[in-house]
């Protein structure tokens, strides 16, 4: 069979193109190198790093890439012990298989599945896995979640958004004096933020329904963005009763864990806003699933957060990629953890908006030496919160 009539120039050109394709698809294509690393990377160590009432979780790998997450809302010594034990489930696993590892830890023990100790620890592990994966690909975590849905993130508290706490506990029925005092505090808050600012009232589960219903009617003229934690988590019937009698939007979710505890609020249509906490509900992985569920019911997220800059930044990554979002709780004054422990790379502007966190990964630098100083400070150690009524009986916290 005769060979096709191809010029020498065409042959050289095609050979050069083949060589170029091979180079681009190989060593000079950073994506290929990253893909190779994500295939061979393994978890080699998981270390709890206590710091006052918080515990940081450090996950190390055989490629020298390290991720960090934060445990909050647990007794630190117990949390640290559980994380140390859970390493057995994570050893030699690929940290980029985030969903697989989430399921492995969550389902590992039938008697701990869904409980606060396991889910809070899993939340920190999940943050650290996303941190590692973002660092491997050299991008902020929100890029891995589908990219940002907004250019900046509205936050509170700040000069443009004020949250008034209930300051309880309160007995079953409030007196006119107690109601008037709460109304006065809310009126003062409205003055602080002005007519364009956001005003939030946190009932903190310490206001019984009769007081809350009275109060909601009295503060309606102050344009409240939402009432937070109006009932003990999971008490759907009370939420339904309050939803029928209160015109201000109701919000809850900070102490509910995973999609399975959030779903009843949506199905019963007894709240207007969901407040998942990235450190309570199962980490970034669960935050994105909760956001998708809530979006189907047209319920926006206003995530709760009382974590340091590490956990807070994880939450910011999640909401950056969440379409239906209202506002993020974000404490930036350093009272939760000294600012030198976890150094962030985002700022809140004069209008109360946080810039998008930059990567790679979470984009937070952890100073383990500074964290150790917090752990050694007797004034910053964990104390069990016990709230009592005037008669000595135990109140909800």
Predicted features along the sequence, with ranges:
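Metal-dependent enolase-superfamily TIM-barrel catalytic cores that perform enediolate-based chemistry
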Residues: 152-245
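Shared catalytic-loop signature of beta/alpha-barrel
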Residues: 84, 88, 93, 100, ...
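N-terminal secretory signal peptides and thylakoid transit peptides that target proteins
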Residues: 1-19
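Glycine-rich, aromatic-flanked loop segments that form ligand/cofactor-binding clefts
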Residues: 126-161
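Metal- or metallocofactor-binding catalytic centers and their adjacent structured scaffolds
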Residues: 62-137, 395
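Extended hydrophobic packing segments that form well-structured cores
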Residues: 362-397
């Amino acid at each position: 069979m005769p060979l096709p009539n191809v010029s020498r120039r065409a042959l050289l050109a095609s050979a050069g193109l083949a060589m170029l394709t091979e180079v681009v698809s190989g060593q000079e294509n950073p994506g290929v190198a990253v893909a190779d690393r994500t295939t061979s990377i393994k978890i080699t160590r998981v270390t709890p790093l206590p710091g006052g009432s918080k515990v940081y979780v450090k996950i190390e790998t055989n490629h020298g890439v390290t991720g960090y997450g934060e445990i909050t809302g647990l007794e630190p010594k117990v949390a640290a012990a559980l994380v140390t034990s859970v390493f057995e489930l994570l050893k030699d696993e690929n940290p980029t298989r985030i969903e697989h590892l989430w399921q492995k830890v969550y389902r590992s023990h039938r008697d701990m599945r869904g409980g606060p100790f396991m889910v809070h620890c899993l939340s920190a592990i999940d943050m650290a896995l996303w941190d590692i994966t973002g660092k491997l690909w050299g991008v902020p975590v929100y890029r891995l979640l589908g990219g940002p849905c907004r250019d900046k993130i509205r936050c509170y508290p700040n000069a443009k958004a004020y949250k008034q706490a209930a300051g309880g506990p309160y007995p079953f029925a409030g007196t006119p004096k107690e109601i008037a005092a709460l109304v006065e505090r809310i009126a003062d808050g409205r003055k602080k933020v002005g007519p364009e600012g956001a005003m939030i009232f946190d009932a903190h589960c310490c206001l019984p329904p009769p007081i809350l219903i009275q109060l909601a009617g009295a503060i309606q003229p102050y344009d409240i963005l939402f009432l937070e934690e109006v009932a003990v988590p999971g008490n759907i019937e009370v939420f339904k009763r309050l939803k029928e009698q209160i015109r201000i939007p109701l919000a809850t979710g900070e102490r509910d864990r995973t999609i399975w505890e959030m779903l009843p609020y949506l199905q019963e249509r007894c709240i207007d806003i969901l407040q998942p906490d990235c450190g309570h509900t199962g980490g970034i992985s669960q935050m994105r699933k909760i956001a998708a569920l809530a979006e189907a019911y047209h319920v926006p997220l206003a995530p709760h957060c009382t974590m340091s800059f590490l956990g807070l930044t994880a939450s910011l990554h999640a909401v950056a990629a969440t379409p239906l979002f209202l506002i993020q709780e974000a404490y930036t004054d350093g009272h939760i953890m000294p600012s030198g422990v976890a150094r962030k790379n985002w700022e809140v502007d004069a209008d109360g908006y946080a810039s998008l966190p930059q990567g790679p990964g979470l984009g937070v630098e952890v100073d383990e030496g500074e964290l150790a100083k917090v752990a050694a400070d007797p004034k910053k150690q964990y104390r069990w919160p016990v709230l009592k009524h005037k008669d000595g009986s135990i109140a909800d916290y």
